[in-house]
Amino acid sequence: MNQAQNSVGKSLDVQSFINQQPLSRYQWRVVLLCFLIVFLDGLDTAAMGFIAPALSQEWGIDRASLGPVMSAALIGMVFGALGSGPLADRFGRKGVLVGAVLVFGGFSLASAYATNVDQLLVLRFLTGLGLGAGMPNATTLLSEYTPERLKSLLVTSMFCGFNLGMAGGGFISAKMIPAYGWHSLLVIGGVLPLLLALVLMVWLPESARFLVVRNRGTDKIRKTLSPIAPQVVAEAGSFSVPEQKAVAARSVFAVIFSGTYGLGTMLLWLTYFMGLVIVYLLTSWLPTLMRDSGASMEQAAFIGALFQFGGVLSAVGVGWAMDRYNPHKVIGIFYLLAGVFAYAVGQSLGNITVLATLVLIAGMCVNGAQSAMPSLAARFYPTQGRATGVSWMLGIGRFGAILGAWSGATLLGLGWNFEQVLTALLVPAALATVGVIVKGLVSHADAT
């Protein structure tokens, strides 16, 4: 009998139980639902970058006027992420996730009917509240349903959904906007999440580890875990999470800022912040930079989509490598290469084929690294503070996204050209590399 398969009346260690079982259809369902949440999160997050050229032309506004609108959703994401983590650690992952999807779906749909910049700015901020809450809590829930041997692989695979959603926004906009206008992308990005929220209400389970830590009742925990291995769960008299003893009765903020976790938290924030500077400068402004350099609207949207699609190609490989090698070194290498290839993109404007290839590779590097960071954070923090730790990393990181979107508008306003803007990305790439490598050297905890 396996260690987790205790005799009747004995306590069942939830994580050991999950580790020892083959991945069930029930767990694959959690993977799929979290993937869909993150996919639609990515589609709505990237929407402004893709509709900006058409919106600017229709409303007769310059690029600088769109800077605050592009940043509005990112500011909302900060508040959504920072607020949702503590809520999920107190009340549960599922309810927060369903609410997040309803919020970003509803306000994305409303954004399609905005008639001026002020309306769009407010609606994009409100959309951002839901977007900011969705991703970290999907990461937390999925990480708590996955065995250690597959944790990084499955979480980074889920994050393929974010990059695929952003890329999908580019491909959809290339076809839909010329035919139906900029509103069409926002309508799609609003209706689909509202439909998904209905599915989540029925099919998404609560985290069993959360139920144990919060003492939500043996029968409820048993019902939640039974689909994985009914006989093993039926034999258990109670359920436990061993880490609970080490951090019990402490607030979530005391956990993530304690001596054990404090420095690691700061380094996670630095790394994710710098990575998002790169991602959002390119996501928000690469199509516009391409248009300014003579590319057609279709070419600009396609190359912008390639940047996101690169993350889809690399995320699974990064997760696989993290489960087998030093995860900090794996991520650090990808950030370093992101800076190198972003610089190369800036040197290749004259050849559209070479440019597209380099954009794809740059996207593979930086988006692959970014997709891996939530998995790294989820492995680092204990259950009591996991949602807060992951969501605060993503929330603080959003300031990097705001800086990236804002700096693109500022640099273009100062007259910087395509090559100069791309060269500047060497700085955040270097800082992200240093941040994650140093975290690997100083971390002494790997709470799972």
UniProtKB/Swiss-Prot annotation:
Q: Provide the membrane-side ranges marked Periplasmic in the record.
A: 52-67, 116-119, 174-184, 283-301, 351, 420-421
Q: Changing residue 398 to A: what effect? A: Abolishes 4-HBA transport
What does the domain comment read?
Answer: Amino acids located between the second and third, and the eighth and ninth transmembrane regions are required for substrate transport.
- Which species expresses this protein natively? Pseudomonas putida
Lipid bilayer topology: Multi-pass membrane protein
Gene symbol here is: pcaK
Cite the entry's keywords alphabetically. Answer: Cell inner membrane, Cell membrane, Chemotaxis, Membrane, Transmembrane, Transmembrane helix, Transport
- Outcome of swapping residue 85 to V: Abolishes 4-HBA transport and chemotaxis
Lineage, highest ranks first: Bacteria, Pseudomonadati, Pseudomonadota, Gammaproteobacteria, Pseudomonadales
| Protein name per the record | 4-hydroxybenzoate transporter PcaK
Name the reported effect of residue 328 to R: Decrease in 4-HBA transport and loss of chemotaxis
Query: What's the effect of swapping residue 92 to L/V?
Result: Abolishes 4-HBA transport and chemotaxis
Which cell locations does it reside in?
Cell inner membrane
A Gene Ontology biological process term: chemotaxis
Would I find Hydrolase among this entry's keywords?
A: no
Q: Which residues lie on this side of the membrane: Cytoplasmic?
A: 1-30, 89-94, 141-152, 206-261, 323-329, 373-398, 443-448
